[in-house]
């Protein structure tokens, strides 16, 4: 079989930078699936992407499908011939349809009878005749929320398409993609290199684009160049570049020929909180801020241009002129905002509606304040130092910065600017930090607050939203989650679990519901919110790699203290790895089935004198000896050690089921054995329902 390398390039107008990688990944995955479905083997597949192109490179692709033999079964021999041995019309029709005579058919004998068969040789189709249709299907499946039309045709794509190139080795593959006929024309950089050139071979794509077109089509290479050059540029001025992955990917998606340059701004702007300046540089301008070794912002930034200029200073000056007004705005907003305290802005929160049925932002801040104070008191009652006064104060001021000029202009600085203004107002440091950390965790992988006051406020902020929105009947449906309730729920669980806070969801939900008063119309609010949080437990632990049966085993016990829930999950995960776990899980399932069939109340206590079999005596004695050791472990939540002790029962349990008839004819013996099994199961149920383990 012969193999060649395939190139497919779609030349477009500028693609959305935040979608570029997703589009390329999806294009590759879809096309690879097409190759597999078509029985076309290949060695490797990769994608290339730049602002004006999506490309695939398939190496070691078979130039044709392999020939294969397909068995085509005909009618049964019993119905293929009449009594005189002549072919029936059914047999003749089948043979004719397969291009043979009945006499040329072979026989297949199975346990169900004898059949006519034809071993048909199917010649493999040439790859070059399949590529265009497969590529079009792959493109049709791309995740494009808002496709657009261009020109006079009805073709739709994320951006207008100007060129299509499909090469199998040096062979040009004919056909159309997205209404554009395939040819060898590749467009280069808009301002450097050749505007367009002809590509002679699939293998020369990257090198020809680089040398003739001044385009680096390799996305990962552009990322690596930008990162390395930005780090070197920052080091040259004694700093460290702030290169976050999402911004790096966006910048790499904006340029075809990355050139890294360093610029500066006036030091006076450093009097403005660094977060506001960084937000302006990164969010608006796509610049990389530079910090010194101690983490202090420097009056410099690094940016990436898409052209190799003979006069880079002109480009630097241009970017400095662009960013200066934005920094000046931030300075003006900061100086203006400082004239009014956060507390003085509380009355203005009355003018902003949080949600029509849930009241204004001022009402929301007051609820958060009371709930945060309640949570802090709960933590204090459990010997965790937490100032309920600070928590209540931070909750009250938590939304005040939304009324500042800075946050109105730079929305992502909410919370952070509240912290800075709180410090300027003379609020305690705990209050200031809690105002900033109320929104944490903001995204998957983000850190959670650790200070007790911050935890109280962050929990209150999320619980108020969660309970309120559920209370007015607007729970998330399907993928829609306009109030980000799933993120809020995961945040609540993470804060409690990662800080091992002794808080009960039932108490927190009840308090939050009470604070909403008559605003809520859903009569099942508390139950619905608790169920929602329990469901988040499952998805969160699955994302962490915990087996589903482990999660279900714990969920069956409905523990409502997240820290306790986590301890149980970890204990059951550990137990699942023990040699005895499989047998004990099966035994628990058997016990559960037996007890489920018992009518009436189960007997509570085991009567030693009614234990007649050696195996049941051994199990009862071992269980009795373990219970004094288990009780303190259950009380302190040391579930892992408890299950480790219970694993010692394996042999006794196995022997019991081997030797003892539970449902004995003697009612007293039967009830005593049921009591023993019930006692056994209750010990495991102190942790989880391990009968659910697979």
Swiss-Prot record:
Give the PROSITE patterns listed for this entry: AA_TRNA_LIGASE_II_GLYAB
Q: Which GO terms describe its molecular function?
A: arginine-tRNA ligase activity; ATP binding; glycine-tRNA ligase activity
- EC number from the UniProt entry: 6.1.1.14
Q: InterPro entries, from UniProt?
A: DALR_anticod-bd, Gly-tRNA-synth_bsu, Gly-tRNA-synth_heterodimer
Coiled-coil residues: none
**What's one GO BP annotation on this UniProt entry?**
glycyl-tRNA aminoacylation
The protein's location, in the record's own words, is: Cytoplasm
**Catalyzed reactions per annotation:** tRNA(Gly) + glycine + ATP = glycyl-tRNA(Gly) + AMP + diphosphate
Q: Which domain of life is it from?
A: Bacteria
A cellular component term from Gene Ontology for this protein is: cytosol
Please report which protein family the annotation says this sequence is part of.
Answer: Belongs to the class-II aminoacyl-tRNA synthetase family.
Self-association and partners: Tetramer of two alpha and two beta subunits.
Q: What is this protein called?
A: Glycine--tRNA ligase beta subunit
Q: Which organism is it from?
A: Shewanella denitrificans (strain OS217 / ATCC BAA-1090 / DSM 15013)
Gene field:
glyS
